[in-house]
Structures are given as C-alpha cells and as structure tokens.
Amino acid sequence: MASPANQTGRITQVIGAVVDVQFEGHLPAILNAIETKNGDNRLVLEVAQHLGESTVRTIAMDTTEGLVRGQEVKDTGNPILVPVGVGTLGRIMNVIGEPVDEQGPVKAEDMRAIHQEAPLYTDQSTEAEILVTGIKVVDLLAPYAKGGKIGLFGGAGVGKTVLIQELINNVAKAHGGYSVFAGVGERTREGNDLYHEFIESGVNKKGGGEGSKCALVYGQMNEPPGARARVALSGLTVAEHFRDQGQDVLFFVDNIFRFTQAGSEVSALLGRIPSAVGYQPTLATDMGALQERITTTTKGSITSIQAIYVPADDLTDPAPATSFAHLDATTTLNRAISEKGIYPAVDPLDSTSRMLSPLIVGEEHYQTARMVQQVLQRYKSLQDIIAILGMDELSEEDKIAVARARKIERFLSQPFFVAEIFTGAPGKFVDLADTIKGFRAICDGKYDHLPEAAFYMVGTIEEAVEKGKKLAAEAA
C-alpha cells in the first residue's frame, strides 16, 4: 500500500550508495521511491529497511556525491514508476524511466511500478513451439522455446554479447512484435553500438515513435549499484506491459550476473551478513523475484534471452548456479572452443534444452542431435589416448569417428551478421531443415572425403562442399 505522499524527511547519513533518512511523521513503505535534489539532478532513493527511531535506510539510484546531512527528502508515495507503452520504443531510458538519448521526453501511455507480483499459476500458459534462430549449434542441440527463458553462460570475452546481438539480429528483425533490451552493468560502448545498429538496420527510427520495435533500458557499468540492481526490473516492467496487451515480446538481458553483483555490493552496506562466496543472503529470493515475472500468460508471451557471466569460468559459482533453475534452455560458451577459433564458442556437450524431445522437435531432429553428441563425446573420451600415443594407435573405427567429430566441430561454427565488420565474412542464417540435413550427412559418412577446413565458418553443407572443391583446386 502506498504511504501518504509528500511526507518530508532529512538525510542523516550517507555511506556510498546507501543513504539514511529520518522522517518526522509517517514512514515511507519498503520499496517506496523518495526524492531529493542533487545539484540539477533529481536523485531517487528506494527504501530498503526501516531502522527504528523514524529512520529508513535507502539505496540511491544515482551517484550520492554532493549530498549533505540535513538535506530535505520527499516521499513520492509510490515505488519507482517507469513509462510504458509504444512511446518507449526506439528510446533509451535509465532505471527511473528518464530518457538518456537526448531525444526529448518519453511519450508514455502510462506509468507503471517496477515492483510487480509474478502472474498467478492460473494465468500462466506454456507452448511447445521452437524459436528458430538460424544459428546451427543452437537450433540443433539446444533449441529455444517460444515464450521460454534462455540463458547464455560464459566467462569473460568468450562471446556472450556478440551471440546476444546475433540473436537480436536474427530473431528480433524477423519477429513482427516488440522487443525490450535491458543493459545491466555492461559496457557503455556496446550499448551505444547497439542503439546505432538498431537505427541503421531499420529496427528503430531515430527519436523513437512510429516504426520502432525495440525499447532500450540501460544501467551500465559506471552506474551505482542501486541502478544496476533495479534496471532489469525497469526493463521487465516495459516488457510486461506489452505482454499484457496481447503482444509476443522478446526480452533481452545483458547481463544477469551484474544484477546479482549489484545486489551483493549494496547487501553489505545494508548490514546483511554475506553468504557463500560473499554473495548476499537473499540471492535466491532476488533472482526468483525477477525470473518468476518473466513468463508467458494467457494474454501474451515473453521470450527472454539472458546473458549470464560466469566468474572465473566456474559454473558452480552461486550466481550462475542460482539462475540455472529458472531456465528452459542453456547455451554454455566454452573458452577452450573459442581458443580453437570456433565461433560461436558454444559447448555442444554442455548446452541443454527441455525442447530437445522427439515429441516436440520430431524424431529426425532428435536422433541427429543425439548422433552428433555421441560422436563428439567419443572424440572427447579418446583425446587422452591421442595426446599420449598419437592418432596412429587408434583403431580404424576410432579414426573415422575422430575425423567426423573434427568436421562436426568445425561445422558448428558459422559467420555472424553482427561480426561482418570485424571478419569481412558475410553472415549466414541457416534454416533448421538444412542444419539437420547437413549434420546427418556428416554423421552418416557422406562427406568423409572432404578436408576438415571445408567445414569451417560456412552456413549450409552445400557451402562446405563448394569450399572443399575450391580448396582441392588451390592445392592441385
């Protein structure tokens, strides 16, 4: 329940991003937004704790440099409200819904609180339909569900953001509905690139409005932890509004780990005792509150694709481990694969999807995926023998399996549209039927005569055959 608005209080203490405020009358409710002036800026503080002696402890959504004790603070009577509706499309907003793209105010249909209840069980709906991404390794081995939650796991610099940008390129551009991108604690440069990329490719119009399809909500690396801990909720609120109007929404988050990290930064300042690896004791609760809202209802769907940073490449770290439970499909990026120059560096044996069932994808797709994994697993188990004794000591059967596995490994790579400017190679979108046909043929030994190099960075199997002919002609 909202507390009476316009109650005023005074700042009694400022410790980094945490500010204590004393009120004389009615205390603002937990999660209420209270406001003060910091120079020319409107500074929003969110109530986190009631301390007693009429004092509340709050988390600042912007820098607290310049605040002084005794400064006046007003209670807004509501949680943080952000603009929602088609007026947000093509615009960049910050955590409190203010535009940061210098294109004037956001024309909002409505203002909506960033803290909402998750939909009831009775309102939720599930579909068993595949979202085709055009990326071979994903579509074959860990297919994404429409209206599902997808996690892209990977350490630093293995290609999570490039993969999410390629998914935006392949899925959001072909998708008729609206998309929302929440940039949580990532590089400002990447956010800027994405904004301009959307305008150049026609997904958005400069200045937003008619013809734009994607709303951007950013709280980047340089923002205080309060903003990074809440910006995912602000983006989700925009997406929920579109869903409740009957839209099928795509919701991209880069990066969910930064949401957890920001929570752990403020947790100690709020006086909570840290839990495992120094994370906040409320880690599972915070993650659940966010993830349970990202769901498909009887009105519309949210398909969410989330990049999840893996600290020190350790998937058992509490932050990535907590997010695993909420996902329908996981795409795990592996540094060892990226070191071989195979991009996207998706681990074919470590990526999973509940959609990979013969009842959903069909018998042929399922069998092909399992054959590919079987060949790769066999190669993996033979690697120790190869390292010690060499290829010559393998049986003829094993030699064939290894040769096919190495071809499959290379065929799992493909050039991306968003990487064209770096590589000079045109991007490729591969249909699911072509993907299945290509891998099935390699497993069946139809292309045993082609060299490994023919399968590297191509789209369909026909391109690999062409490349093989070209390589043979050059060698002759």
Swiss-Prot record:
GO MF term (any one): ATP hydrolysis activity
Localization in the cell: Cell inner membrane
Catalytic reactions of this protein: ATP + H2O + 4 H(+)(in) = ADP + phosphate + 5 H(+)(out)
EC number: 7.1.2.2
Alphabetically ordered keywords of this record: ATP synthesis, ATP-binding, Cell inner membrane, Cell membrane, CF(1), Hydrogen ion transport, Ion transport, Membrane, Nucleotide-binding, Translocase, Transport
Function: Produces ATP from ADP in the presence of a proton gradient across the membrane. The catalytic sites are hosted primarily by the beta subunits.
Subunit and interaction comment: F-type ATPases have 2 components, CF(1) - the catalytic core - and CF(0) - the membrane proton channel. CF(1) has five subunits: alpha(3), beta(3), gamma(1), delta(1), epsilon(1). CF(0) has three main subunits: a(1), b(2) and c(9-12). The alpha and beta chains form an alternating ring which encloses part of the gamma chain. CF(1) is attached to CF(0) by a central stalk formed by the gamma and epsilon chains, while a peripheral stalk is formed by the delta and b chains.
Similarity annotation: Belongs to the ATPase alpha/beta chains family.
Protein name (record): ATP synthase subunit beta
Species: Nitrobacter hamburgensis (strain DSM 10229 / NCIMB 13809 / X14)
Gene: atpD
